[in-house]
Amino acid sequence: MTDQTLPQLPLPSSWRPLRLQTLVILRWLAVIGQTIGVLFVNWGLGFPLPLLECLALIGLSAVFNIGLTFRLGPHYRLPSRIAALQLAFDLCQLGGLLALTGGLENPFALLLLAPVSVSATSLPKRQAFLVALLAAVIASVLAVMHLPLPWEPDQHIVFNRIYVIGIWGSIICGVVFISAYTNRVAHDARQIADALAATELALSRREQLSA
């Protein structure tokens, strides 16, 4: 038996490339949820908001998704830099939507943590850190720059500044925790998976040599 027929041990890896389809599906879910939310607030609750601008931002995300799917194909494996740029786009799109609908006063501001979570579990540390940093910057900008929260036309709701600072602090804590702890847990899990795969291949190779 020649050495060419023997299985080769895998090289250790700290991350595995994401499939484009994974981010595309998550983005479609975001598009559907954002569309339903905006239309329900505007027409269902009767709260005025900049509807055309909100729908334009949501449409931009949909067009981005369609373009990526046709250009690269759903099974394309994304390099870490490209995956990080896509998550950065998602953060900026969500940040723009939140800026039009109340900033951090909007209860859906918590969704800023979603791209951070995806990056922490699937990207190398450097790219995951940059995505987390962008989320923190967007949250900080939204704390001071945003349109009023959609509410009853004859009422103007004003949140205490300390409360808004508390929301900002909780999001920043979430960003730090997810980017550090989740990334470390995912890294350890990948190392264990790599070690098990290497052990299985080594045993298989030994069996073939002794056959």
Regions found by a protein language model. Give the residues of each.
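Central hydrophobic cores of alpha-helical transmembrane segments in multi-pass inner-membrane proteins
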Residues: I58-T69
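A conserved signal-transducing helical linker
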Residues: P10, R16, A193-A211
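Juxtamembrane or sensor-core-proximal signal-transducing alpha helices
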Residues: T2-P7, G67, R71-G73, G166-A202
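Alpha-helical transmembrane segments and their interfaces in multipass membrane proteins
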Residues: L20, I32-I58, P74-L85, S122-H187
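Generic transmembrane alpha-helix motif of multi-pass integral membrane proteins
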Residues: C92-G103, L110-L130
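N-terminal membrane topogenic signal
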Residues: S14-L29
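Short, Lys/Arg-rich, polar N-terminal cytosolic tail immediately upstream
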Residues: M1-L18
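Alpha-helical transmembrane segments of multipass membrane proteins
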Residues: T35-L39, I66, G95-A99, S117-V118, ...
